[in-house]
UniProtKB/Swiss-Prot annotation:
Task of the protein: Component of the cytoskeleton-like structure which stabilizes the shape of the wall-less Mycoplasma. This cytoskeleton-like network of accessory proteins containing HMW proteins 1 to 5 allows the proper anchoring of cytadhesin proteins in the mycoplasmal membrane at the attachment organelle.
Protein name according to UniProt: Cytadherence high molecular weight protein 2
Encoding gene, per UniProt annotation: hmw2
Keywords: Coiled coil, Cytadherence, Virulence
Phylogenetic lineage: Bacteria, Bacillati, Mycoplasmatota, Mycoplasmoidales, Mycoplasmoidaceae
Presence of the UniProt keyword Coiled coil in the record: yes
Coiled-coil region(s): 28-838, 914-1591, 1632-1723, 1777-1804
InterPro entries: Cytadherence_Hmw2
Keyword flag Transcription regulation: no
One biological process term in Gene Ontology: adhesion of symbiont to microvasculature
Length: 1805
């Protein structure tokens, strides 16, 4: 069979009582609901708190008008409120969305599960139908094959008959032919013979035609057979395809289910992510609340500062303020201590909540174990008296050992049964896996639902906390009410869990009872005839049990109600005002409960009456049947008398218990529960006895019916009588043992009372010692206050030192200023030297100019002489030519001199520009330094004023330490020496802190001494509690509650001690870290950034100075190193600040939890001293309104001081008392943990054994599956071989048909060969028929074998079902197993017969190979395949037999073990019945002990009431600490808002920087366009120069006279040569003139281009400087709000941009003006000039006009320059020397700066 052919089994797995995660899933559901509720409640709580805060702030705003800070805070709070409302809506939407998503996934899972079941059902139906169709098809195929064989036989017979006829006719023809050959024959005879021969030939032809028709029919039938074989093959192929399709479809559904599982996992992950996101939001809200609290503290400080200023106006007020500040410092220290206590309390509360959850899980686990033990005891011992005897020392060892043995035996039975179930459910493995996957989906769904439930529960918790914050006045009453609700809720949950477990247990009990009844039915043969009557008796028993269960449930409800009332009564005793009313109400309810209990008692009596009626009826029947047996009558009468005596005793016991319930209260309820269990067990025993009596009646009836078997029945009755006598004797022994136990318990109780009296005396002595210790602690605290005052004075001295250090820093800054002035003087000296050098250079230049002037004068003289000698030109032509040559040589020499001077001048101009640029930069840097220096001095002065104000305002230790840290940190950043001093001072602080820690350690040592004493007392109390714990199951429930409370308190005490030590060690450190975060972000980082700016500017200045001088290089390097160190320190500090910020946020929460615990400890005194509590509340209110009601504080301050001292004393006393109680609970919990660990180890050991057995069963199951798979594989291989054999046979058939046709053709030609072939054909046909018969027979056998294998699989399934029914019918299973063995033996015989038949087939095939050589190869292959098949079948048969034998041997062993265990259980039940009788006797003794226990229980109640009071007081303090936490959260939120404001300002600054950069880029592009335009102008000038080459000397001369002015300048630089253009000389040639003009224009254009490029570079440089400054300011703005500096830099940038725009506009105007003049030059003609040739005049005029315009522009720039001195030479013109002035230098410097900015912008792009 194939894997998918397995049908799903509907048999459920046998449940043995283990929990399959039901409780865990339920707990997770509730937890998810609680988490959702907590988150929702927290959001609502935050919204409500913000609304209240808005109301308060609005009230303050109405009181104090025109307060912008309050308006800002109100706006911030409104924004936060809207944000929280939106988050709450989003949370609701997400929750609903996830619920819808989960429901959709559930629907999908249900849909796919239904589809899967439907497909499985369809698959099963489809397979059944296909197998049926296949069987029908195979049957039809075999029928057709048989028909075909019959047709072939008929055809062969007809062919044989035709051949015989043909042979006969042929013989006749031959004979007639022989007669015709006789010569003696007559003509008539001859004719006659010829006619006969013709007829014979005609008949022969007819016969041949018939033979051909038969062969055609034979071929048609063969084709039909082949087509049928093909159809069969197609059917098999379709089956395989259908199987493949089904597998594919099945796999797709499995994939879809896996996808659904993945989706569910993803949704679960999404839920987890959402939960984490919500938790992050909650953390953010906490941080926001803390920030708000910090902001409120800042506001309070500002208000206190204002009050201090108003109070400092009068001197007498100042004197009073000094004293008040001292007291304020003390209060602040106490406030810090309370704050730390609150933090530690909050941490402890969180840990206690976690521990409560763990403890709840632990209780659930213990409850499961207890219920499991209870179920075991109900099944095995049929009594619950063992719980009472469990805590008794004498009976403890015996009951424990026997109970463990019973548990082990029953677990082994359960293990065996589970092993049988696992073996029997092999066929339904896939269905089980699918069921498990669906169960996993359900579990995941339950987990998701539970998560939502936990979230809802979290929301509810948040709402509760919010209501608690709103109702501060009713904190105590509401806390008590909430505690009651929580206790009631937990009790309800536990009751629900108990009911669920009880239902499961009842189901298991019913199943086991049913199983045991069936075993009893099979054990006795005579019970088969009495099934109807026994069924009636069983129904009556079940009805009675149901009624008894109803009564028990009612009693449980009454007990729970009574327990609740008792708890409320005990809790409300503490409330003095309402105690009387509640007592009356509770007493009335208690009386009503007593009445209901009486009604239940009446119902119980009615139940007993019904039982008595049934017993009477049974007695009547028994008397009628046992008239002949007087011995049996006497026995039954005595048993009835004993039963009545037991009933009377039981009634008396119940009456006594009911009387004692009024006194015992809550403890007596548990005892009444045990009495009910005892009555239930007695009733069950009575029913068992009645059942045995009915069995006796049945035996008596059988005696009447069957007189012959009377002796056998008498023997059975005698045995039953003996068993009854044994039980009666065991009951008497149990009564005696109970009486002995009662006496022993009385003795132990008397001893216990004596020990309690001794311990009370010891308690009194301990209380006296604790009072003395509290007084000592008070004295120690006063000493500590004195120490703090001394430390305060020391700190004032340190502050003075710090002021001195600040003055030293100022002195250092002044020294630095002087050093920079010295550097400036040196730079001035160097500039003076450079100026002298320039003057020397100017003197040389003047000498050259004098020479040029002489040349000019000579030129003028020459001109005069030339005009005078015009008439004499011819005469003096030769002299003129010689003179011309002479002056040409002289001009060439002067030209060389000009070029040299030009080079020198260019070098000098470059040096001059560089020096002036450097000088201007130095001046700017010096101005910037002066400004920064003034800013630093102003900042230092402001800092000094702030320090003075802070010293006058607040003398708190915390602020003084912070200022000290800031001053030391600034000192560290300034110099390395200051850093060392800071480290020394910090070391001193550490030493002081260690001294303080040592003082705290001394306190801890004293506390440890007290804890040792408390532990000793706890050890004694532990013995008392252990002794009380041994009193029985009647105190079990209450002891569990008390242990849970004790464990919580003990855990709280441990955590308090740990947190207290940690807090003492890190108290000052954490306070310093808190102030570091707040102050470093607001003040220290500002100072660091300012220092960094100064160092950066110094660095740039020093870099520039270093370019010119190397005097201060060492100082620069030292400052650079210092700056790098400070920058690293700043980065490290910023990283540490960020890390500490996150760390301290966590520490704030831990401090909050610690403070919460401390405040809970302090709140204990409120219950005992109501008046003092009211005064302390007034003091807290006065502390919160200290700023508004400061005058009233002055009067009441001394009184409050004394009250606080008293509060500290009472706090110490309460702490010591609490420590004692907690240490006692600690010892008790340790003992309980040891017992729990022992039980846990036992359970784990038994679990390991079960696991080992379960693994063995799984291995056997896997082996069986492997064998099944191997059988299936072998079956498929055999089927494949058979199909191959059938194909070979078909091939042989085709070959045989071909051979038959060849034989038929040869028969016509050769008669002799025909006979032989006919003989061979007959023989082959016969052999073929034999082979076909054998093949068909083999196929039938194969089919039978396959059917047998299938039947064997079906039988295995049937046997598995029968083995499952083995739990119900063991005897019937034995017979079925025997039948199975017989069937397997028959199958074994069938397999052997098949093997023999196959051997016979092999022999026949061997004989056939000898006759037919053509088929030897095929037959050998068939033989080999058959041999292999037979070997495999034999091997499979052997393995199958081995597996079956193993299984049945294992089943026999299991059956024997079950029978052995049942016998052991019977023996144990007998022993437990005997022990139960003893326990009944001991129960009577326990009734006497109740009176002695009452007094002790009252003492325990008083002690527990005290513990409850302590818990109530701690809850009150917890609420007050929650309020302080909320204030801290608000302060944290204010810090977050400040950070957000800083980020927003940074973003605005970045935007402005980007806009400025874009503007600079635009200006740069404009300058670049100007450069391009200058290049175009240069090209135009080049073209004009080319035109001037063609002009003549005369036109040039005339143009020069008309247009050129006497002074010509280019760009403000004096030209060294007076005549700039060579055409001024009429003696020179035209080529020289054009070259010189071209050179001059090129020089002019190059100079202008260089000037523009210099301006561009300057703009780029300035832009880089501005970007650096912007980056610095951006860094500063990320840490602090430096809007003022940003505005300054922004204004500077705007001014520079305006300057650049103005300069660029000037350049644009100049260039546009030049272009306009060039374009308009053609139309412009001066009046004094009339050119001769038009084209020459226009070109010359245009060029000269441009030169004039350029010269005018330069003159306009130099209009304030004086004209230099001129030395006359013998020439006609003189050019004065004009130098540069400071205004042009400044203008060039600004243009250069703009160019640098633009160039830097271009480079950055």
């Amino acid at each position: 069979m194939k894997p998918f052919d397995k049908k799903p089994s509907l048999q459920p797995i046998y449940d043995i009582g283990f929990d399959d995660g039901y409780l865990q899933s339920e707990y997770e559901k509730n937890r998810s609901k609680t988490d959702v509720d907590k988150i929702e409640n927290q959001l609502l709580k935050e919204i409500k708190s913000l609304e209240d805060e808005l109301k308060n702030l609005k009230g303050l705003k109405n009181q104090a008008e025109d307060n912008p800070e309050l308006d800002k805070k109100i706006n911030h709070l409104e924004v936060d409120l809207n944000r929280l409302v939106n988050e709450y809506k989003n949370f609701q939407f997400q929750k609903n969305h996830m619920v819808d998503k989960v429901s959709e996934l559930d629907n999908l899972t249900r849909f796919y599960k239904n589809e899967l079941t439907r497909l499985q059902q369809e698959n099963a139906d489809f397979l059944n139908s296909k197998y049926a169709n296949l069987a029908n098809f195979q049957a039809n195929y075999h029928n057709k094959l048989n028909d075909f064989h019959r047709l072939i036989e008929n055809q062969n017979q007809t062919i044989n008959r035709l051949n015989q006829k043909i042979n006969g006719n042929q013989n006749l023809i031959d004979n007639n032919v022989a007669l015709l050959q006789n010569p003696n024959i007559t003509v008539e005879k001859k004719n006659y013979l010829l006619n006969v021969i013709d007829q014979l030939y005609n008949e022969l032809d007819q016969l041949e035609n018939q033979k051909r028709l038969l062969s055609i029919e034979y071929e048609n039938t063969y084709r039909e057979l082949v087509s049928a074989d093909n159809e069969l093959q197609n059917v098999y192929e379709n089956i395989d395809q259908n199987q493949i399709q089904f597998k594919h479809q099945y796999q797709t559904y499995r994939d879809e289910l896996s996808q659904l599982e993945r989706k569910i996992q993803l949704t679960k992950q999404e839920l987890v992510d959402k939960e984490s996101a919500l938790r992050v939001k909650i953390d953010d809200a906490d941080f926001y609340i803390n920030a708000r609290l910090a902001e409120l503290d800042d506001v309070a400080k500002q208000l206190s500062f204002q009050d201090g200023i108003t109070k400092q106006n009068a001197q007498h007020v100042e004197d009073k303020l000094v004293a008040l500040n001292k007291e304020k410092d003390r209060l602040n220290t106490q406030k810090e201590a309370f704050f730390n206590l609150r933090q530690s309390a909050l941490i402890d509360i969180n840990k206690l909540q976690q521990e409560n959850e763990l403890f709840a899980k632990h209780l659930e686990h213990q409850q499961n174990e207890f219920e499991q033990k209870q179920s075991d005891s109900l099944l095995k011992l049929e009594t619950e008296y063992k719980a009472l005897q469990h805590k008794i020392n004498e009976f403890k060892n015996e009951s424990a050992t026997k109970s463990e043995e019973l548990l082990n035996q029953e677990r082994e039975l359960f293990e065996k049964r589970r092993e049988i179930d696992t073996l029997l459910t092999q066929a339904s493995l896939e269905y089980e896996h699918q069921r498990e996957s669906s169960q996993l989906l359900k579990d995941k769904q339950n987990e998701v639902k539970q998560h939502f439930q936990n979230l809802e529960y979290a929301k509810k918790e948040l709402d509760k906390e919010r209501n608690l914050l709103d109702q501060q006045k009713k904190v105590d009453s509401e806390a008590i009410f909430q505690l009651k609700e929580k206790v009631a809720q937990e009790r309800k949950e536990l009751e629900e869990l108990y009911l669920v477990k009880k239902q499961k247990q009842d189901q298991k009990e019913n199943e086991l009872l049913f199983f045991e009844k069936q075993l009893k039915q099979h054990q006795a043969d005579f019970e088969n005839e009495l099934e109807a009557k026994q069924q009636e008796l069983f129904e009556a028993k079940h009805a009675l049990e149901r009624s008894f269960i109803k009564l028990e449930d009612k009693e449980k409800d009454l007990n729970t109600k009574a327990q609740q009332i008792a708890n409320e009564f005990s809790q409300l005793k503490t409330d003095k005002s309402k105690s009387a009313d509640f007592e009356l109400m509770l007493q009335n309810e208690y009386e009503n409960l007593q009445q209901e209990k009486q009604k239940l008692f009446q119902e119980r009596t009615y139940f007993e009456r019904n039982a008595a009626v049934l017993s009477n009826r049974l007695q009547q029947k028994r008397e009628e049947l046992l008239q002949q047996k007087e011995t049996l009558d006497q026995l039954t009468k005595s048993f009835e008398q004993e039963r009545l005596i037991n009933q009377r005793e039981h009634k008396e016991l119940v009456a006594s218990v009911e009387k004692q319930k009024e006194i015992l209260g809550k403890k007596l309820q548990d005892f009444s529960q045990t009495s009910l269990n005892a009555s239930k067990n007695l009733a069950e025993r009575e029913m068992a006895i009645k059942f045995k009596e009915k069995e006796i009646e049945a035996t008596e009836k059988q005696l009447l019916n069957d007189v012959n078997n009377a002796e056998v029945i008498q023997a059975d009755l005698a045995q039953l009588n003996q068993s009854l006598n044994q039980e009666r004797s065991e009951l008497q022994n149990a009564k005696q043992r109970i009486a002995d136990f009662h006496n022993d318990s009385l003795k132990k109780l008397n001893e216990y009372e004596l020990s309690l009296q001794k311990r009370l005396q010891e308690l009194q002595t301990l209380e006296a010692n604790q009072k003395q210790h509290s007084y000592q602690n008070q004295a120690y605290f006063e000493g500590e206050l004195d120490k703090l005052n001394r430390e305060k004075q020391a700190f004032l001295n340190l502050r003075k030192k710090q002021t001195m250090e600040v003055d030293a820093i100022k002195q250092r800054l002044s020294d630095k200023h002087q050093a920079l002035n010295m550097q400036q003087a040196e730079l001035d000296r160097k500039t003076h030297e450079l100026n002298n050098a320039f003057l020397n250079h100017d003197a040389d230049q003047k000498s050259l100019q004098d020479q040029l002037a002489t040349v000019k004068e000579t030129q003028k003289l020459i001109d005069l002489e030339r005009s005078a000698l015009l008439e004499k030109q011819r005469e003096f032509a030769e002299n003129v030519a010689g003179f011309k040559r002479h002056w040409s040589n002289k001009t060439s020499q002067l030209q060389k001199i000009y070029e040299l001077t030009k080079k020198q001048e260019s070098e000098q101009t470059q040096k001059e520009t560089e020096l002036k640029i450097a000088f201007s930069d130095l001046q700017k840097d010096y101005q910037v330094f002066e400004l920064q220096k003034d800013q630093e001095f102003r900042q230092i002065e402001a800092k000094q004023r702030e320090l003075d104000k802070l010293a006058e305002k607040n003398n708190q230790v915390k602020l003084e330490l912070d200022n000290r840290f800031q001053a030391l940190q600034n000192q560290k950043q300034d110099t390395v020496q200051a850093q060392l001093e800071l480290e020394r001072e910090q070391h001193q602080l550490n030493l002081e802190q260690t001294a303080f820690n040592q003082a705290n350690e001394s306190l801890l040592k004293q506390r440890e001494q007290l804890t040792k004493k408390i532990q000793a007392f706890h050890y004694e109390l532990k013995k008392r509690n252990q002794f009380l714990a041994l009193k029985g199951k009647r105190l079990f429930a209450k002891e569990q509650d008390q242990q849970r409370k004790d464990q919580e308190i003990n855990w709280r005490f441990k955590q308090f001690e740990k947190e207290y030590t940690d807090f003492d060690e890190a108290k000052k450190r954490e306070l310093e870290e808190l102030e570091k975060i707040r102050r470093s972000l607001s003040q220290s980082n500002v100072e660091l950034e300012r220092k960094r700016e100064k160092l950066a500017t110094d660095f740039t200045n020093l870099n520039k100075v270093q370019h010119n001088t190397q005097i201060n290089r060492d100082q620069l390097n030292s400052q650079i190193r210092q700056f790098l160190l400070e920058r690293k320190n700043f980065q490290r500090f910023s990283n540490e600040a960020n890390a500490k910020k996150a760390f301290l946020i966590k520490r704030l929460r831990s401090f909050a939890s610690n403070l919460k615990l401390q405040k809970e400890a302090l709140a204990i005194q409120k219950l005992e001293f109501d008046k003092r509590d009211e005064q302390q509340k007034k003091e807290l209110q006065q502390a919160t309104l200290q700023l508004e009601q400061f005058k009233f504080e002055k009067q009441n301050f001394d009184i409050e001081k004394q009250r606080q001292l008293v509060a500290i004393k009472t706090q110490c006393e309460k702490l010591s008392d609490e420590k004692k109680a907690l240490n006692q609970k600690l010892v008790e919990l340790k003992n309980l943990s040891q017992t729990y660990l022992a039980n846990k180890n036992k359970a784990e050991y038994s679990q390991q054994q079960l696991q080992q057995k379960y693994t063995n069963l799984l291995d056997l199951k896997e082996n069986l599956e492997r064998t099944k798979d191997q059988l299936d594989k072998k079956h498929r291989s055999i089927f494949a071989r058979l199909t191959k054999f059938a194909n070979d046979l078909r091939f042989e058939k085709k070959q045989l048909l071909k051979a038959q046709r060849i034989v038929d053709d040869k028969n016509r030609l050769l008669k002799e060969n025909e006979r032989n072939l006919h003989f061979l054909s007959n023989e082959t046909e016969r052999k073929r028929a034999v082979l076909e018969d054998q093949i068909s027979y083999f196929e039938k056998q194969r089919k039978q074998a396959t059917d047998a294998i299938l039947a064997s699989h079906k039988e295995v399934k049937k046997k598995e079902g029968e083995l499952q029914k083995l739990l119900v019918e063991l005897e019937t299973r034995k017979t079925k197993l025997n039948n199975d063995f017989a069937k397997f033996s028959r199958q074994r015989e069938e397999f052997e017969n098949q093997r023999l038949k196959l051997l016979e087939l092999q022999k026949t095939l061997q004989t056939q190979t000898n006759s037919n050589n053509f088929k030897t190869k095929a037959i050998q292959e068939i033989e080999n395949s058959y041999k292999r098949g037979m070997e495999e079948l034999n091997f499979q048969k052997k393995e199958f037999d081995k597996n079956k034998s193993r299984l049945y041997e294992y089943f026999r062993k299991m059956r024997d073990e079950i029978e052995r265990k049942e016998s052991q259980v019977k023996l144990v039940l007998k022993e437990t019945q005997r022990k139960a009788n003893l326990l009944e006797a001991q129960a009577n003794k326990l009734n006497i002990e109740k009176n002695t226990i009452d007094f002790k229980e009252k003492e325990l109640k008083a002690f527990k009431d005290k513990v409850d009071q302590d818990i109530d007081s701690t809850n009150k303090q917890r609420k007050e600490l929650n309020e302080l936490l909320n204030e801290n959260k608000l302060l944290q939120q204010s810090l977050i808002e400040r950070e957000r404001a800083i980020n927003s300002k940074d973003s605005l600054l970045n935007k402005k920087i980007e806009t400025i950069k874009r503007q600079l880029h635009d200006k740069e592009m404009r300058v670049l366009r100007l450069v391009d335009r200058m290049k175009l102008a240069e090209q135009k000038y080049q073209t004009e120069i080319n035109r001037l080459r063609t002009q003549t000397f005369d036109s040039e001369k005339q143009d020069i006279k008309n247009f050129f002015p006497p002074l010509f300048k280019i760009n403000g630089n004096d030209m060294a040569f007076p005549y700039l253009y060579p055409w001024l000389y009429p003696q020179q040639k035209q080529d020289d003139n054009t070259l010189q003009i071209r050179q001059l224009f090129e020089q002019q254009l190059q100079f202008m281009q260089q000037r523009y490029e210099n301006e561009l570079n300057e703009l780029r440089r300035q832009r880089n400087l501005l970007e650096k400054k912007l980056d610095q300011i951006q860094l500063e703005s990320q840490l602090n709000n430096k809007q003022s500096e940003f505005s300054k830099v922004e204004s500077m940038m705007e001014k520079l941009l305006e300057k650049t725009e103005s300069r660029l506009n000037d350049f644009d105007q100049k260039i546009n003006y030049l272009t306009k003049k060039v374009n308009q030059h053609n139309t412009y003609q001066p009046s004094s000039y009339q050119p001769t040739p038009s084209y020459q005049d226009s070109d010359k005029q245009q060029l000269l006009f441009r030169i004039q315009e350029l010269e005018k522009q330069n003159l306009f720039q130099q209009q304030f320059q004086p004209a230099p001195a001129v030395v006359q030479q013998p020439t006609s013109f003189a050019a004065p020397n004009i130098t540069k002035q400071q205004q042009i230098a400044q203008l060039n410097a600004e243009i250069n700066n703009i160019k640098r900015l633009i160039a830097q912008k271009a480079a950055s792009k």
